[in-house]
């Protein structure tokens, strides 16, 4: 009996060593293919943005490549991005957008992606992002007089945007513009003024003929614009400087018919954003906030000074393929280093990659 047990143990050990465990291989973060996947991920972010500003790739932090059955492989990617000066509605190509500098109170994004590579094609399976402005301490060390981001719901910000849009409409020979979103604001100490950036939408009214703005409707072919304004506080009056850039009209996208199989979802048009939605705490899905019949109350969201990328993908489920893929990043993996021999010594992982602009 003892001999049989010993033979059984030896056979089980043989099976364990004979069958290779599923593992990933680590990838050079500055490898051309890794950069290609990262740029695809950034495009995915910007294509889903309806508010805030476009982001650009700053650094690739980590790349893991998982095998997938029956074919293909999945890139698990961590990247850093930086906010640009191009609004999400601005059709300017990302390559022509300037990165917002540290002295302008830069915003950094942190994103996790899973991207499928199959038959030479890349497809985003899942995305998770958040973004954070640079700390006030770091900015003031570099530039003591630089204004910081101001909460978008500040009364002075709302008044400045309204005053700037009113001033622009009074001199505008085209369509009457309505406010869509206050995107960014700063309180400038000297001279005392409020700097604000906001988006607008054209209506079916002529600006100089409007008597009742409530009767003006947005155009069927949506046409948006982006405005920058400085409203200075003078004695008994305000001094307004405002410029607006109107983008080409967007053609109407056909709405999916109810009950039609395979109908594609249409992104909603941007809307006025008086308050940001409450996001679930880190590590919790929206469904986890409900325990039996009891709804767990959430604290009100703090005033925000920028559009957090977390809201772009909030509530969006993972799109990981259910076709029997061998992709389990939650399990303890076997790491396979590419082109690494069996020689003893520490393995140097070529990650994180290079910083393309600056790190905050």
Swiss-Prot record:
Keywords, in A-Z order: Cell adhesion, Disulfide bond, Glycoprotein, Phosphoprotein, Repeat, Secreted, Signal
Residues modified as Phosphoserine:
131, 135, 318, 321, 323
CDD domains noted in UniProt: CY
Instruction: Return the annotated region ranges for Disordered.
Output: 260-285
Q: List all disulphide bridges recorded for this chain.
A: 29-351, 86-97, 111-129, 143-146, 205-216, 227-244
Q: Does the keyword RNA-binding apply?
A: no
Q: Where is the signal peptide?
A: 1-15
**Gene Ontology biological process terms from the UniProt entry:** acute-phase response; cell adhesion; negative regulation of bone mineralization; positive regulation of phagocytosis; regulation of inflammatory response
> Where would I find glycosylation on this chain?
96, 153
Per the record, its GO cellular-component terms are:
blood microparticle; extracellular matrix
On tissue specificity, the annotation reads: Bone marrow.
Q: What region holds the Cystatin fetuin-A-type domain?
A: 24-130, 141-252
Q: Name one GO molecular function term.
A: cysteine-type endopeptidase inhibitor activity
Subcellular location field: Secreted
> Where is it chiefly localized?
secreted
UniProt similarity note = Belongs to the fetuin family.
- Protein purpose: A cell adhesion protein that binds immature cells of the granulocyte lineage.
| Name this polypeptide is given | Alpha-2-HS-glycoprotein
Protein species of origin: Oryctolagus cuniculus (Rabbit)
């Amino acid at each position: 009996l003892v001999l049989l047990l010993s033979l059984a143990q030896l056979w089980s050990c043989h099976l364990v060593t004979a069958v290779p465990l599923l593992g990933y291989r680590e990838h050079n973060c500055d490898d051309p293919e890794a950069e290609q996947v990262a740029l695809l991920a950034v495009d995915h972010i910007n294509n889903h943005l309806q508010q805030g500003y476009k982001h650009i790739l700053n650094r690739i932090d980590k790349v893991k490549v998982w095998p997938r059955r029956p074919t293909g492989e999945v890139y698990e990617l961590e990247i850093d991005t930086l906010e640009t000066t191009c609004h999400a509605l601005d059709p300017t190509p990302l390559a022509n957008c300037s990165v917002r500098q540290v002295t302008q109170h830069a915003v950094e994004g942190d994103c996790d992606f899973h991207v499928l590579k199959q038959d030479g094609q890349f497809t985003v399976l899942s995305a998770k992002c958040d973004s954070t402005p640079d700390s006030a301490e770091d900015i003031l060390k570099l530039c003591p007089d630089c204004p910081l981001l101001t909460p978008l719901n500040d009364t002075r910000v709302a008044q400045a945007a309204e005053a700037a849009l009113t001033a622009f409409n009074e001199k505008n020979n085209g369509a009457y513009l309505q406010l869509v979103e206050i995107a960014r604001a700063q309180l400038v100490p000297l001279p005392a003024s409020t700097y604000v950036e906001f988006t607008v939408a054209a209506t079916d009214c002529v600006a100089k003929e409007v008597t009742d703005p409530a009767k003006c409707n947005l155009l069927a072919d949506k046409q948006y614009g982006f405005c920058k304004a400085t409203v200075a506080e003078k004695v008994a009056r305000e001094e307004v400087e405002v410029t607006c850039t109107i983008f080409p009209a967007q053609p109407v996208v056909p709405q999916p018919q109810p009950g039609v199989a395979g109908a594609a979802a249409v992104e909603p048009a941007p809307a006025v954003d008086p308050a940001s939605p409450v996001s679930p705490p880190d590590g919790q899905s929206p469904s986890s906030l409900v325990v039996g019949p009891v709804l767990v109350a959430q604290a009100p969201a703090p005033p925000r000074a920028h559009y957090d990328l977390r809201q772009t993908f909030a509530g969006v489920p993972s799109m990981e393929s259910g076709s029997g893929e061998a992709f389990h990043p939650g399990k303890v993996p076997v790491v396979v280093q590419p082109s690494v021999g069996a020689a003893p010594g520490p393995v140097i992982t070529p990650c994180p990659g290079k910083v393309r602009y600056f790190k905050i």
